[in-house]
Amino acid sequence: MPSIDEVDEIILRELSKNGRATLTELSRKVGLTPAAIKNRVEKLEKLGVIKGYSAIIDHSFLGEFLTALIEIELADPESDELSKLIRPILKLENIKDVYKKTGEFQLTIRATFRDVDSLNEFLKKIRRDYLKNMARRIKVSIILENFKEGGVTLL
């Protein structure tokens, strides 16, 4: 794991709050020149510490009014087949996040959909095309309201 210093940590915390922060804004927070900040940000990107930048959007403007958490209990959580399962799922457009975790359900997927029918179609598709015999159970929860996303308070 790459080592970072206190200044890098401040830059990372500021960028996690606002990925569009300018070099000038960051330089004021840290006390370095914008050129020095630029060098540090580029170094953090090159090292893979900064993995990318994205906007937090209201998916309803894309016609996606429903967000669901899909939890999957794997038949064999230690199977080498897991990476083969996850790679094609990551390419599906509605999927926003995928987590491997401890507990009763080893995979959690956060995805957005137009409606319940499109969610049901998606569940049929992943069961049929991806999960096959790898899933013991699937549990779905619908998000009713989102208060914070990507570190940004939405209230």
From Swiss-Prot:
The keyword Secreted does not apply. Keywords: DNA-binding, Transcription, Transcription regulation. Gene3D superfamilies: 3.30.70.920, Winged helix-like DNA-binding domain superfamily/Winged helix DNA-binding domain. One of its GO terms (cellular component) is cytosol. GO terms for biological process: response to amino acid. The lineage of its organism: Archaea, Methanobacteriati, Methanobacteriota, Thermococci, Thermococcales. GO terms for molecular function: sequence-specific DNA binding. The keyword Transit peptide does not apply. This is Uncharacterized HTH-type transcriptional regulator PF0054. Residues 4-65 form the HTH asnC-type domain. Residues 23-42 bind DNA. It holds the Pfam family HTH_24.
